A protein has these predicted regions:
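Stable alpha-helical elements in mature extracytoplasmic
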Residues: 36, 44, 83, 87, ...
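Gly/Gly-Pro-rich "capping" loops immediately C-terminal to redox-active cysteine motifs
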Residues: 37, 41, 57-84
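Bacterial N-terminal signal peptides
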Residues: 12-22
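Electrostatic cytochrome c docking/interface patches
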Residues: 25-43
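Axial heme c-ligation environment in periplasmic c-type cytochrome domains
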Residues: 64, 71, 90-120
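The canonical Cys-X-X-Cys-His
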Residues: 40, 44-54, 98, 113, ...
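Bacterial N-terminal signal peptides that target proteins for export
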Residues: 2-14
Length: 122
């Protein structure tokens, strides 16, 4: 069968799939190597510690005044339920009182921070 745009069903499905994947895919991850986790720690200390705290519990000096409270990265259940893609999106775009880091941190730096915050729940 041909669609109204002149595509047969198979070509239409392939084209639609490519378009869908290209608009929803998250950029390539940085590997959670010890080196990248260490770099993520340095970035976390510079950009995240004031709200999320030194131990990732969301109890940093600036975080105490925020509502809702910053995410507690030590909550093993919550962290296990979070996908890397979802956390990366929240770091990138921000959420609630948390600012977006899309323009403040490079993509690989955001992945490094993500890998570091995962260490709090281990």
């Amino acid at each position: 069968m041909t669609t109204r745009f002149g595509f047969n069903d198979a070509r239409f499905i392939v084209l639609a799939s490519v378009l869908l994947l290209s608009t929803t895919a998250v950029a390539q991850k940085v590997e959670p190597s010890p080196e990248n986790i260490s770099k993520g720690e340095a970035i976390y200390k510079k950009h995240c510690l004031m709200c999320h705290g030194a131990t990732g519990m969301g109890d940093g000096p600036a975080g105490k005044r925020l509502n809702p409270k910053p995410y507690n990265f030590q909550d093993k259940e919550k962290m296990a339920a979070e996908t890397d893609e979802h956390l990366f999106k929240e770091i990138t775009k921000g959420k609630g009182p948390m600012p977006a880091f899309e323009r403040k941190l490079k993509e690989d730096e955001r992945w490094m921070v993500l890998h570091y915050i995962r260490t709090f729940a281990k």
